[in-house]
């Protein structure tokens, strides 16, 4: 029973992550200025806390900006 609950929770978490990344991709497609690699104004630097890769200058986020 516990294993089933853990598996269901993991699948739901993965589904939410996929929906979140799909929304971010669509937003970047609509706003071309966000796709520019030279865009650094207003972004967070390496080691800063983040929720989404869009917030980071390098575009990679795992609770903190990676690059």
Curated annotation (Swiss-Prot):
Cite the domain annotation text: The presence of a 'disulfide through disulfide knot' structurally defines this protein as a knottin.
What lineage does the source organism belong to? Eukaryota, Metazoa, Spiralia, Lophotrochozoa, Mollusca
User: Which Gene Ontology terms cover its molecular function?
Assistant: ion channel inhibitor activity; toxin activity
Which Cys residues form disulphide pairs? 43-57, 50-61, 56-65
Question: This chain belongs to which protein, by name?
Answer: Conotoxin Cl6.6a
Q: Which domain of life is it from?
A: Eukaryota
List locations, semicolon-separated: Secreted
Q: Which family does it belong to?
A: Belongs to the conotoxin O1 superfamily.
Q: Looking at the keywords, is rRNA-binding present?
A: no
Q: Where is the signal peptide?
A: 1-24
Q: Which InterPro entries match?
A: Conotoxin
Cellular component per GO? Answer: extracellular region
- Name the propeptide positions: 25-37
Record keyword Nucleotide-binding present: no
According to its UniProt record, what is one Pfam family this protein matches? Answer: Conotoxin
Q: In which tissues is it expressed?
A: Expressed by the venom duct.
Q: Which keywords are on file for this protein? A: Disulfide bond, Knottin, Neurotoxin, Secreted, Signal, Toxin
């Amino acid at each position: 029973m516990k294993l089933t609950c853990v598996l269901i929770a993991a699948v739901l978490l993965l589904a939410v992550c996929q929906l979140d990344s799909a929304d971010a991709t669509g937003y970047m497609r609509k706003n071309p200025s966000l796709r520019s690699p030279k865009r650094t104004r207003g972004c967070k630097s390496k080691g800063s806390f983040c929720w989404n890769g869009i917030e980071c200058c390098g575009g990679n986020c795992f609770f903190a900006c990676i690059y």
